A protein has these predicted regions:
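Bacterial N-terminal signal peptides that target proteins for export
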Residues: 1-11
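Short nucleic-acid-contacting surface segments enriched for D/E, G, S/T with interspersed K/R
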Residues: 81-97
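Short boundary/loop segments of OB/S1/cold-shock single-stranded nucleic-acid-binding domains
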Residues: 22-37
C-alpha cells in the first residue's frame, strides 16, 4: 500500500514538472502568432545565454519616443551554426527584426528574421511549439 502511494505521488509530480517544462518551451504560451511585428532600431545589448539569446534594441515609436525592446532568439548554438556570433551585433548596429509580439503587451517579441544593414537576412531560430509555420525555418521543409 505504501509503495502504491509513493508511485502515484511520483507519477503525479512528474506530470506537473513535464507540464511546466512544456509551457516554458511553448511559443504559444508567450507570443501571439496573430500579432506579427517589424521593429527597426539599434542594438543596445546582446545576451548570449542559454536557453535563448536576447537582443535588446532601441526603437522609435510613431511619436519619435525611443522604446527599449527585447527580442528572443534561438539558442547560442543554433545561431552559431547559422553564422551569428556574440560579436556580430555590436552596440549601435541598425537592424530590422520581424517577429511576433508578446501576449502580455510588453515590449518583447519572438524574433523570426533579422535583417542586417547590408541586406543579409538570418532566421533567428526561435521557433517552437505553437510558432507559425511560414516556411522560413529550414527545419520546416
Amino acid at each position: 500500500m505504501r509503495l502504491q502511494r509513493v508511485l502515484i505521488t511520483t507519477f503525479a509530480a512528474l506530470l506537473l514538472v513535464g507540464a511546466a517544462v512544456s509551457a516554458h518551451h511553448s511559443f504559444a504560451a508567450e507570443f501571439d502568432s496573430n500579432k506579427p511585428i517589424q521593429l527597426k532600431g539599434t542594438v543596445t545589448r546582446v545576451e548570449w545565454i542559454n536557453p535563448h539569446t536576447w537582443i535588446h534594441m532601441a526603437v522609435k515609436d510613431a511619436d519619435g519616443k525611443t522604446e527599449e525592446w527585447m527580442i528572443e532568439g534561438g539558442t547560442p548554438n543554433t545561431l552559431l551554426r547559422r553564422g551569428l556570433t556574440k560579436t556580430s551585433l555590436p552596440e549601435g548596429t541598425e537592424i530590422v527584426v520581424d517577429g511576433y509580439r508578446a501576449k502580455n503587451g510588453s515590449n518583447r517579441a519572438n524574433g523570426r528574421d533579422l535583417t542586417f544593414p547590408d541586406g543579409r537576412r538570418l532566421f533567428l531560430g526561435s521557433s517552437g511549439t505553437g510558432a507559425p509555420r511560414d516556411g522560413r525555418d529550414t527545419s520546416e521543409r
